Amino acid sequence: MSKNEFLEGLKKALSSTNDQRLINENYEFYRNYIEEELNKQRSEEEIMQELGDPRLIAHSIR
């Protein structure tokens, strides 16, 4: 899974909340986290494996 696929999956999974603020805050949090980790020379694949399924993350947020 790529960074963009992860972020879009997270956004889609959170969309059922109809809370745009919650969606935006979490989208930006994970986008920033991924960028920070990439800047530490970690691979996108490694970061995505660490984060796991965006649907499970969304479920824990809701």
PLM ranges: what are they?
Residues M1-R62:
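Soluble N-terminal domains of membrane-associated systems
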